[in-house]
Amino acid sequence: MKVITGGVTAAKGFEAAGVEAAIKYKNRKDMAIIYSKKPCVMAGTFTNNVVKAAPVLWDKKVVEESPYGQAVIVNAGIANACTGKEGYEYCRKTALRASEALGIPEESVLAASTGVIGMQLPIDRIEAGIEKLVKAKTDTIEAGTQAAEAIMTTDTHSKQAAVEIEIGGVKVTLGGMSKGSGMIHPNMCTMLAFLTTDAVISKEALTKIVKEDVEDTFNMISVDGDTSTNDTLLVMANGMAGNEEIKEGTPEFEAFKEAVHYINETLAKMMAGDGEGATALIEAKVIGAATKEEAKILSKSVVCSSLTKAAVYGHDANFGRMICALGYSGVSFDPDKIELFFESKAGRIQVFKDGVSTNYDEEEASRILAQPEVTILADMKMGTKEATAWGCDLTYDYVKINADYRS
């Protein structure tokens, strides 16, 4: 696997664009398009929130019922959630306008939105934005970057990744982009993620890979514990690489799965580290758990702990907060067997063993926690299973950003 520059336009046959449409923001790009020159096999996962935004309902229908997809229209600023029948009708109008402009079936167009909940979309601006997107779309790396920038809300930077692999001697490319900064606690922010590939793969095989991998990547991040109404991951495969079809149970399937995992994990970590107001990416790694599921529960409990997040922000080696988070996770374990470590580029230090503090050096621990990427490692001494979750520190700016989000 080779990591390359780019995002959703890295794979053969994909075009993108980002334009200003004045949906809610002024003087910035706020609409994006991803378009494939050929119809795509589609797979997707969506929010588990009972309250689902209109575009989530639309996209679920397209992914499940349409034979293929070919374009995605994304807007930032307004979520089109809690908008009733009118909001869903605006999804249909978005798809209709895009289908007319692109010359493709309405049922092959997907829609995604992110932003303020409860506001109706200005459909006239959406339709005008679609016209601009269709004219602007190209297959350049820059076009992919513009699309990634256009879908941002409180994100501080765009998020992209791309790789190349070989399938039966044929080069296959995968690329992706995502957005998410606040309201990220997906169980599939708002978390939006889009992957494109030129691989030849069946819908069944692609769906299996996506649904399994999301459990170890996007569903293992948390910024603020809120699961959005709009969380969406869409994957498009247009087959233009011309490889022999990837089938389950083959080495090619595993190679493709590894590439999808790399893209998903890279984008997930970018989102976790770009939490609203964040200064550090927190990685909570649990090893020695009895089961994989328990390892996941334990690691997510740590990254979801507000007290843990605040401690990392303050570079305070208050290990009790992490032990406490493990303790209320719902997983049974022997506290006297746990070993807890802090790790970063500044070093590694053990802070807890045999049920008590290790009398560690506070200054050394603080230096380790002062790095932009920090790992909290917990060895449960119960088995061989492990899991990793990602989050960010909790700062004063998080409250400031969300106190006036609608203004």
Label every PLM stretch briefly.
Residues 1-75, 79-89, 99-407:
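A structural signal for small-residue-enriched, beta-sheet-centric alpha/beta enzyme cores
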Residues 95:
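Generic structural marker for isolated residues within well-ordered, non-membrane alpha-helices
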